């Protein structure tokens, strides 16, 4: 069995500078640019997650216990459909047409060779312990989807939906970019088709496994940046000889928060230096 104590990322600092190229329960909201026939769906806050416009990544760590053992998973990511009625917390500007039934489709996946990106359905509180669908790296025209509207497609129904207990995982360490699209599954449009047209594809970056994103050297300190899921404590360790097996903690521990964070070693010796991040705990 793998042990989380051996999971770390490594960076080497020689003479000079060497660099390797908060949201909790994160929500991405789906709605529409209009409510007439063929008006386009969209992700209302998608700009904050667009991998082409930002370096932001949703961090995932290898789970060593619980339902997702053996897979990389981060904090919960929830896709929600904006409400159109008062009982569901609406009307919210940008909601889809009444009678639409929204789903999020996984269209494309890039990432490490042999890897895959999977969706786990939930019961409202936690995932059900089985992969609902898995999309391999290299996919460019995926059709798998998860329903996000809490209706049955009846005419006039509120498109609202907010499901908890769902999870997304990666099967191998590395950086993934997953293309998501909102589609309308209803048959309440012209000719028995959907009301709304599909959204543009939103590319979202996931980082499976701890990774030092940047390293900066100053006169009296070295600072590294990284991302980690909430409730995971991380420590920066260093050694002057990688073959010695002697790693000493030099900064932290620091609990993750899904956002870019920093750990700093002050007054490091002016010699070759090796760094790694190590997580101190794991979650189910």
Question: What residue spans do the PLM features occupy?
Answer:
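Short tyrosine-centred short linear motifs in exposed loops/low-complexity segments
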Residues: 171-180, 232, 271
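N-terminal secretory signal peptides that target proteins for export/translocation
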Residues: 1-6
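Short, composition-biased motifs enriched in small/polar/acidic residues
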Residues: 209-284
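Bacterial Sec-dependent signal peptides at the C-terminal "C-region" and cleavage site
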Residues: 20-24
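Short, hydrophobic beta-strand segments
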Residues: 166-171, 265-267
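Contiguous segments within soluble domain cores/interaction surfaces
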Residues: 25-165, 181, 186-209
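Bacterial N-terminal signal peptides
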Residues: 9-19
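Hydrophobic residues positioned within well-ordered beta-strands of beta-sheet architectures
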Residues: 166, 178, 202-204, 224, ...
């Amino acid at each position: 069995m793998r042990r989380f104590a051996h999971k770390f990322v490594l960076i080497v600092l020689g003479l000079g500078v060497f660099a390797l190229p908060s949201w909790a329960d994160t929500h991405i909201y789906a709605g529409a640019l209009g409510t007439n026939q063929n008006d386009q769906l969209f992700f209302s806050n998608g700009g904050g997650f667009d991998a082409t416009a930002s370096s932001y990544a949703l961090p995932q760590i290898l789970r060593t216990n619980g339902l997702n053992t053996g897979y990389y998973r981060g904090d919960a990511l929830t896709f929600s459909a904006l409400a159109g009625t008062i009982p569901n917390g609406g009307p919210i500007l940008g909601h889809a047409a009444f009678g639409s039934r929204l789903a999020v489709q996984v269209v494309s996946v890039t990432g490490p060779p042999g890897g895959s990106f999977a969706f786990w359905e939930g019961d409202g509180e936690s995932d059900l312990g089985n992969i609902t669908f898995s999309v391999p790296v290299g996919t460019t025209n995926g059709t798998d989807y998860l329903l996000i509207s809490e209706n049955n497609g009846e005419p006039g129904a509120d498109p609202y939906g907010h499901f908890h207990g769902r999870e997304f995982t990666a099967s191998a360490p590395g950086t993934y970019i997953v293309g998501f699209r909102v589609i309308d599954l209803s048959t309440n449009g012209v000719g028995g088709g959907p009301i709304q047209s599909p959204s543009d594809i939103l590319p979202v970056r996931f980082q499976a496994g701890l990774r030092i994103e940047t390293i900066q050297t100053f006169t009296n300190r070295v600072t590294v940046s990284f991302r980690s899921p909430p409730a995971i404590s991380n420590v920066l360790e260093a050694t002057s000889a990688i073959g010695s097996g002697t790693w000493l903690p030099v900064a932290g521990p620091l609990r993750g928060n899904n956002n870019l964070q920093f750990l700093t070693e002050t007054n490091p010796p002016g010699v070759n230096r090796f760094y790694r991040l190590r997580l101190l705990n794991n979650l189910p």
